[in-house]
Each structure stands twice: as structure tokens, then as C-alpha cells.
Curated annotation (Swiss-Prot):
Binds 1 FAD per subunit. The active site is a redox-active disulfide bond. Catalyzes the reduction of glutathione disulfide (GSSG) to reduced glutathione (GSH). Constitutes the major mechanism to maintain a high GSH:GSSG ratio in the cytosol. The lineage of its organism: Bacteria, Pseudomonadati, Pseudomonadota, Gammaproteobacteria, Pasteurellales. The active site is at H445 (proton acceptor). Its EC number is 1.8.1.7. It comes from the Bacteria. Its main location: cytoplasm. It comes from Haemophilus influenzae (strain ATCC 51907 / DSM 11121 / KW20 / Rd). This is Glutathione reductase. Belongs to the class-I pyridine nucleotide-disulfide oxidoreductase family. FAD binds at S14, G15, E34, T41, C42, K50, G115, D308, T317, H445. NADP(+) binds at A180, I183, E186, R203, R209, G267, E315, V348. Keywords: Cytoplasm, Disulfide bond, FAD, Flavoprotein, NADP, Oxidoreductase, Redox-active center. The gene is gor. Disulfide bonds join C42-C47.
Amino acid sequence: MTKHYDYIAIGGGSGGIASLNRAASYGKKCAIIEAKHLGGTCVNVGCVPKKVMFYGAHIAEAINNYAPDYGFDVEVKKFDFSKLIESRQAYISRIHTSYNNVLAKNNIDVINGFGKFVDAHTIEVTLADGTKEQVTADHILIATGGRPYRPNIKGQEYGIDSDGFFALTELPKRAAVIGAGYIAVELSGVLNSLGVETHLLVRRHAPMRNQDPLIVETLVEVLAQDGIQLHTNSTPSEIVKNADGSLTVRCDGQSDVTVDCVIWAAGRVPTTDKIGLENAGVETNEHGYVKVDKYQNTNVKGIYAVGDIIENGIELTPVAVAAGRRLSERLFNNKPTEYLDYSLVPTVVFSHPPIGTVGLTEPQAIEQYGAENVKVYKSSFTAMYTAVTQHRQPCKMKLVCVGKDEKVVGLHGIGFGVDEMIQGFAVAIKMGATKADFDNTVAIHPTGSEEFVTMR
């Protein structure tokens, strides 16, 4: 007999889990279909393990770059990479347990299998043993997330992707990270800090090109200072496996790069191609992203989508969580106008040092408001944590303001501790704070964040 639910999520990542937990709190009968591990990309091969690796790299930096000038004579006889991985995976396992406990408490059924639409209200699930079962629901959420992109070039199979990075059991001596986005920059920083000879290959003139120019310029400066070898205007045309097991990355018009490990970090694609969207009549664009309106509705009544798979979305875990919860509020808690405002979403890149940003870059503000209506404030200093050492690191910040009242429409920073500064400022900017509001806030000294309220 086919089991019927009020609400089903295909995909047990952050967005699906958040939406179902909220729906269940209103007494709805829910099920989540997940083919791999609960938590999706974020918990298993994304935010969580990435942040653990960031912290591990941070400790290595403290020992190697800063400890001597703070009076610590530290000698690390051995770095046990396997211990770091063991600790990381144990932490992830505890998160899995927590998810299972919360879902069980909320009486949400967890169906371990691969879900595929049969029609607009029916999903066929292929279980681990190969058997199939069908479930139906009044409301279905597509939350299948994304997967790493690999280019179609000769030898691409010799490289690993970001998922493969988190499957490494030992560190390579030399690595080439291919990509210009935040994933590539973050992985490069981790590898370099842990002692790997690291090459970062980007297609154009710099990584993170969509960031504010001040951030991009400073990032490039720090990459060079820290020893990451940046290869610009480098588009791989072939990966060659050599007799000694090493890999050579060949780029048109550029020098070859020979390493022990190649990591593809050149973007992600939506995991929507095998879930039978055509059977339900759900529309996607030419790249497989699901078309939705501001309420997360697809073109098919009763089918919704959140997270990395939606067209023109923001591929961040908190965005999927927020959209999923608001969707359940609208569907099951009598809030028909509830939706997520996708503007002014704060973001952080866990580079070395980290980047934090919310709102418009200076070029974006000029394009939107006109140069005559934009005023920019900047600050440049050395992070105090590093200022007392020989390994000084820059910290740079910018406020982008518009109009006579100088409304703050953009805030950007790169430097030690910036990742933990941005959240509160995002609240202020979301509320419409002006430069005068920032000026009227007493600074906390000595901190990096005080620069945002003392710029002139």
C-alpha cells in the first residue's frame, strides 16, 4: 500500500530538513528522502568539514607564523593528518546523530533511497537493496542540492573534486587547485597552511572577481605573501598522468604545472537531471536549475524548490534553511505572504585571511545609483594579532554609501577575524542604517570591527 504524506522533501540537506522540521511542528505528516547522508553537501562535503579544515590550518599558521614572536618555541615533530580527519568525521557523525534524533522527535519518516517523480504527487524511491516503493504527498519539496562540476577535457578523471578533497587520507606534497571561486580559494588556503606546495589556477586575471575590487586586490597580495602560486589566465586543456604518478596540468598559452594532486573547484551544477522532473512537468532552465517564483513555487501546483538547485538563487546553506522555513510557514501556518527576501545576504569566504561581505560592491553601487550618488569609505591597517610578529597580515575594509543620507548599501572586509564581524553589521544594513548611524555607535577597542564605525 502506498504511504501518503502531507509533505515530502526529496533531499535530506539543510533546506529540506529545516522545512520539514518546521512543517512537523505544525502537526503535518512528513517524510524526507535521502540517497546518501543526512545533512547534504554542507554537513558532509561542504561547510562543516571545510570549517574544521580551516581551523586546522589556522592552528598550523599560529604555530609556524606567529608563535615565535609571542615567545613560544614550538617544535612540531609530526603533523598527523589522519588524526585531523578522524576528529572531523567524528564531529560529522555527531551531527548525523543529532539530525536523526530531531527528525525522530518530530515524527518525520526518513526514507533512505533515491527519489524520482512518477507524477506531480507520486515519488518512486529506489532503496539500498534495489527494491522500489512509492510514496505520495499533497506537497513536495525539491531540495536535492548540487554537485561539483568537471570540465570535459582529456584527463579530467585524474583530478579529484571538492568531494574528493574531503576523502583524502593523506596530504599530497604538491597540489593544483583549479577554479576562481570561494571553494578554490578556501581549499588552496588550507593546503598551503598545512605545508602543501599549492598552485591556484584561475581562468582570468584574479580569483573571486565578483568581490569588491579592494577585496580582490588584497587577496591576491596575501596569496603571494603566503606562498600560494597563483596562475592567472590559465584554462586547463589537458591533464597528463606521468610515469611516476605525478600529474601535469596543461594550459593553452601558459606554462605546464606538475603536481601530485589536481583538485577541480570550478563551480557546481544542480542535481536535478535524474529525479524525473519531466514526469511531474517541472520546468528548469537550460542548465538544469529549477524555475521558481519568490514564494519558492515551481510551475506545478504543490511542488516547490529551495537551495542550490533554484534559478538565480544563492548557493549558501543559511539561504536554503531560511527559504525552507518560510515556505513551511506559508504552507502550514496561515502566512500566505511569507517568503525569503534574497537581497542583502551576508557571506563569508574562509580564506586566509577570511573575507566578509554584505550588499553591493562599489562598481555595483555605481551602476545602480550613478557615480555621483555613491560615496566610499575605506580603512587599511595591520591586524593586531599579526602586527606584533614578523608575519604581518593586512586588513582592509570598505563601506559603500549612497544618497544624501549616505545609506550604507555595501560593507566589505578582508582580514583576521572579519568572518565573525559581518553578521551584526548585516542586521544594521538590512534595517537601513546610514553612515551617521555607524558614526554614532561607540567603537570597541582594540578590535578590527571598530574600523567599520570610525571611518572618515
